[in-house]
A protein has these predicted regions:
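Hydrophobic helical membrane-anchoring modules
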Residues: 1-3, 177-271
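Short beta-strand/loop segment that forms part of the nucleotide-sugar
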Residues: 7, 30-40, 62-64
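Short, well-formed alpha-helical segments that are part of the catalytic scaffolds
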Residues: 11-26
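Short helix-capping segments at alpha-helix termini
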Residues: 25-28, 53-58, 85, 199-200
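A conserved acidic beta->alpha catalytic loop
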Residues: 37-46, 97
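Acceptor/aglycone-binding surface of glycosyltransferases and processive sugar-polymer synthases
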Residues: 64-80, 89, 101-183, 217-220
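Short beta-strand-to-loop acidic/aromatic patch adjacent to the donor-nucleotide binding site
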Residues: 86-98
């Protein structure tokens, strides 16, 4: 059984470390890479196909024709990987490799060893090693974190780290429905887990694991306007999950509605 890794990409032509990705997948047959092109306007798609040509059986490409945000890209990748019966675990990581492969493999090892449903990286948990981040970004992150803690009501230090891995069984619950937010979908992931498992049980089924290394790479896709709007967007998420979306969904319902991407989604797949 394999672990599928989703790598969402938007205008990553000049930032993708193609050599690192190809080397990793050629050396790790127990993994499968799923790159999701989120309507890039540069030559990202061509770069992805060049990588696939070097490892055609171990790399897949999901091409979202219109830029729709990281949430949609990750969800599209999850739906595709779930259709592959040999995939036992599905995770995602950032295209800039701000979290490296060593840390991601450690997340997978913990998921298997502790039989958890979700294991996710943390840049804030005690024990983290070489974490590099500029001062203003660090201050703003702490500010946003307080809003998120209020919304979740769970003792999670870092919801927004771009490295998470899920047991196959929980994937339909997390990714069945489209996310409300384009970028803050990590918060929605934990809200969905909390609603499905209950506040009393969710923390025993998930693990927050310190990263040994995480580096903020410049040229972020989130601008100043996005940052200013974050508190309002978080409030919008809270309203949707606590006032509007109050329906309890079972695992059977989620699995029944969790279908492979189709032509109606304006998505092309190179398996």
């Amino acid at each position: 059984m394999k672990t599928g890794i989703i790598i969402p990409c938007y205008n990553e032509e000049k930032r993708l470390n193609t050599k690192a990705f190809v080397s990793f997948i050629q050396e790790h047959s127990e993994y499968h890479l799923c790159f999701v092109n989120d309507g890039s306007k540069d030559n990202t798609l061509e770069v992805l196909y060049d990588m696939k040509a070097q490892a055609p059986q171990a790399i897949s490409i999901v091409d979202v024709k219109k830029n729709s945000g990281k949430a949609t890209a990750v969800r599209a990748g999850a739906r595709f990987l779930f259709s592959m019966p040999e995939i036992a675990h599905i995770g995602f990581m950032d295209a800039d490799l701000s979290t490296d492969f060593r840390d991601f493999k450690d997340l997978v090892k913990t998921l298997k060893r502790e039989n958890k449903l979700v294991v996710f990286g943390s840049r804030n948990a005690q024990g983290s090693g070489a974490i590099e981040r500029n001062f203003m970004r660090n201050v703003f992150s702490k500010f946003v974190k307080q809003f998120i803690l209020l919304i979740l009501g769970l003792p999670i230090r870092d919801t927004q780290c771009g490295a998470k891995v899920f047991s196959r069984s929980i994937v339909p619950v997390v990714y069945e429905e489209a996310f409300v937010s384009r970028w803050l979908f990590d918060v929605e992931i934990f809200l969905r887990l909390k609603k499905f498992m209950g506040a009393a049980n969710v923390m025993s089924n998930i693990t927050e694991q310190p990263l040994m290394r995480w580096v903020h790479v410049e040229d972020s896709k989130l601008g100043m306007r996005d940052a200013i709007e974050i508190p309002g967007r978080l409030a919008h998420i809270w309203f949707n999950y606590n006032v509007i979306n109050t329906t309890d969904r079972t695992l059977a319902t989620a699995e029944a509605n969790f279908t492979l991407v189709s032509s109606e989604d304006n998505i092309a797949i190179a398996a």
